């Protein structure tokens, strides 16, 4: 509901009274995500910390004020303590809630309708043309570029493009309608997504369903929580420009691997994020809570 947190509490209480089971979704910015990032221990890096150092940013100050010291955070705590179950959609959100709510927490991956995801133009090719440049896609949201690390990733990519202009092609879109964004993405091989994440989020997951190779968070924890041991299609990058550059350079140096990574990306989504499998997991969790 587009209401202030203090006005939403009565709505939650009404829902609680009129439903046998109530669940909280841990899918994005909330008190426990902010708290975990700021403790500088739960994550090696996140939107809020790099190692033992808190990232000093105006937008983080805003989130801290809202979620740690404001009514949003108090409402979040109240619902988390009162609800019957909590669903975490990414490893990061699971880790954020697990310390306090392990007994009612369930990790269920984000859903992707794989069948409706259009494939990139070269998905069916088994060999990458030796003479063709690798096409990198970067979507920029001006107000979130620095927060999500797009600025750092783009600098590394531009450096590689300047050094190897015949082997690297950059497709950059900025603040465009979603349909135009999707069309531009389909002409590319590799998507650059978030720098400070352990896992691919919705934008990257959708791209993987379409056969793009994703440069984002692919830490071991993200595979372990899924039980994924045989494929590792995500190009994991550490949150610094030097590592991003090295990973991008390796993709260009070994571009013959791109078709395999493309197919593994699609397989990853089919296995772990298929919307019907996810729906069944929600139903199973709901039914497991007896009331």
Task: Give each language-model segment a name.
Residues 9-21, 47-86:
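Membrane-proximal helix-turn-helix segments that form the acceptor-binding/catalytic region
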Residues 24-70, 143, 219, 226-227:
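Acceptor-binding helix/loop patch of EC 2.4 sugar-transfer enzymes
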Residues 33-34, 63-107, 155:
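A short, active-site helix/loop in glycosyltransferases that binds the activated sugar's phosphate group
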Residues 108-120, 124-148, 154:
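Conserved donor-binding/catalytic core segment of Leloir-type glycosyltransferases
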Residues 186-199, 212:
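Acidic donor-binding loop of glycosyltransferase active sites
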Residues 213-220:
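Short hydrophobic beta-strand element within catalytic cores of glycosyltransferases
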Residues 256-287:
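A charged, aromatic-enriched C-terminal amphipathic alpha-helix characteristic of glycosyltransferases
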């Amino acid at each position: 509901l587009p209401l202030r947190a203090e006005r939403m509490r009565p709505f939650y209480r009404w829902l609680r009274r009129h439903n046998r089971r109530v669940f909280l979704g841990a899918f994005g910015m909330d008190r426990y995500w902010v708290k975990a990032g700021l403790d500088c221990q739960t994550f090696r890096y996140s939107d809020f910390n790099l190692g033992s150092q808190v990232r000093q940013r105006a937008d983080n100050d805003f989130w801290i004020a809202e979620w740690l010291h404001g009514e949003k955070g108090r409402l979040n705590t109240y619902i988390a303590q009162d609800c019957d179950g909590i669903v975490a959609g990414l490893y990061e959100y699971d880790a954020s809630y697990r310390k306090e709510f392990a007994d009612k927490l369930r990790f269920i991956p984000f859903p992707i309708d794989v069948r409706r995801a259009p494939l990139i133009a070269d998905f069916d090719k088994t060999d990458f043309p030796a003479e063709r440049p690798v096409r990198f896609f970067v979507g920029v949201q001006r107000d979130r570029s620095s927060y999500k690390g797009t600025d750092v990733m783009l600098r590394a990519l531009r450096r590689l493009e300047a050094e190897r202009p015949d082997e690297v092609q950059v497709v950059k879109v900025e603040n465009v309608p979603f349909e135009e964004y999707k069309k531009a993405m389909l002409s590319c091989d590799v998507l650059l997504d978030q720098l400070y994440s352990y896992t691919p989020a919705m934008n990257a997951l959708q791209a993987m369903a379409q056969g793009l190779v994703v440069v984002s968070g692919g830490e071991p924890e993200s595979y372990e929580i899924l039980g994924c041991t045989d494929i590792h299609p995500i190009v994991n990058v550490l949150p610094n420009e030097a590592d991003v550059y090295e990973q991008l350079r390796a993709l260009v140096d070994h571009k013959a691997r791109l078709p395999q990574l493309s197919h593994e990306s699609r397989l990853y989504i089919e296995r772990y994020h298929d919307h019907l499998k996810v729906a069944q997991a929600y139903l199973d969790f709901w039914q497991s809570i007896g009331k």
